[in-house]
């Protein structure tokens, strides 16, 4: 399972541990990923995603999963999230028509 947020695209970063003597050793910084079930208002069901805590706060700030997906560009989203975005857009167009 990859260590990448499905909504924001945040992945691991590489840096150094720096000792008191300024010795540097390589290390990785992993995103704080959580397995969560987010509710889609348009689809009326829950969707299981692997999301970073930063992404979770962003989704809540925008007003829910549907708003987040429709406002976010496709290049940041995972394949599952892009499919979900397409389904939500279709459902909203059907309701509007």
Curated annotation (Swiss-Prot):
It comes from the Bacteria. It comes from Rhizorhabdus wittichii (strain DSM 6014 / CCUG 31198 / JCM 15750 / NBRC 105917 / EY 4224 / RW1). NCBIfam families: L28 (TIGR00009). GO terms for molecular function: structural constituent of ribosome. This is Large ribosomal subunit protein bL28. Belongs to the bacterial ribosomal protein bL28 family. One of its GO terms (biological process) is translation. InterPro entries: Ribosomal_bL28 (IPR026569), Ribosomal_bL28/bL31-like_sf (IPR034704), Ribosomal_bL28_bact-type (IPR001383), Ribosomal_bL28_sf (IPR037147). Pfam families: Ribosomal_L28. One of its GO terms (cellular component) is cytosolic large ribosomal subunit. Keywords: Ribonucleoprotein, Ribosomal protein. The keyword Cell division does not apply. The gene is rpmB.
């Amino acid at each position: 399972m990859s260590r990448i947020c499905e909504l924001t695209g945040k992945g691991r970063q590489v840096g150094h541990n720096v000792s008191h003597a300024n010795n540097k050793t390589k290390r990785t910084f992993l995103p704080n990923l959580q397995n969560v079930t987010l509710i889609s208002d348009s689809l009326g069901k829950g969707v299981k995603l692997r999301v970073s805590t930063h992404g979770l706060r962003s989704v809540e700030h925008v007003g829910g999963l549907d708003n987040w997906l429709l406002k976010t560009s496709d290049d940041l989203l995972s394949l599952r999230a892009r499919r979900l975005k397409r389904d939500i857009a279709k459902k909203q167009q059907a309701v509007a028509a």
